[in-house]
């Protein structure tokens, strides 16, 4: 490869490297502790990303190919209201836990279909939604009525 070709490629490689680094940082949000106290007396702890603004809520877990079993995403809607979720551009099957302002789980949409544009309603007004890997709620015995513990529910 001649020197003029190398001099043209080098800036492109540098730009591509920066893009990869910036894209990776989108997923490097700080993780927060969240626990679920089941009615059976068990406590399950997760590390969650919290989506607090419109941009983060719109992005959600889109385009991700994996998520550790002990992690999830908590969507903070900022007020109690009926919400609907969907799985557009989301490759991971998920359990969606719809959570009331007092931290109790109102509804669980289990094993949602990846890439679906079908809406998944909360069924009642909620403050937030917790997304976990599909099957997690059933495996850990998490059910409606269980209590989610996180600073969001201590407002």
Q: Language-model features: where?
A:
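Extended hydrophobic/aromatic-rich secondary-structure runs
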Residues: 1-5, 25-28
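Compact, glycine-rich, soluble single-domain proteins
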Residues: 28-155
């Amino acid at each position: 490869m001649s020197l003029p070709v190398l001099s043209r490629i080098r800036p492109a490689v540098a730009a591509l490297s920066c893009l990869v680094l910036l894209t990776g940082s989108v997923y490097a949000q700080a993780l927060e502790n969240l626990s679920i106290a089941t009615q059976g007396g068990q406590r399950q702890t997760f590390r969650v990303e919290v989506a607090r603004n419109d941009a983060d809520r719109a992005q959600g877990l889109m385009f991700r190919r994996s998520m550790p079993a002990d992690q999830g995403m908590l969507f903070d809607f900022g007020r109690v209201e009926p919400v609907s979720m969907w799985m557009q551009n989301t490759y991971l099957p998920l359990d969606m836990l719809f959570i009331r302002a007092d931290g109790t789980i109102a509804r669980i949409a289990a094993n949602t279909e990846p890439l679906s544009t079908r809406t998944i309603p909360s069924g009642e007004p909620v403050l937030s939604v917790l997304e976990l890997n599909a099957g997690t709620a059933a495996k850990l015995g998490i059910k409606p009525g269980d209590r989610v513990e996180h600073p969001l529910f201590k407002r």
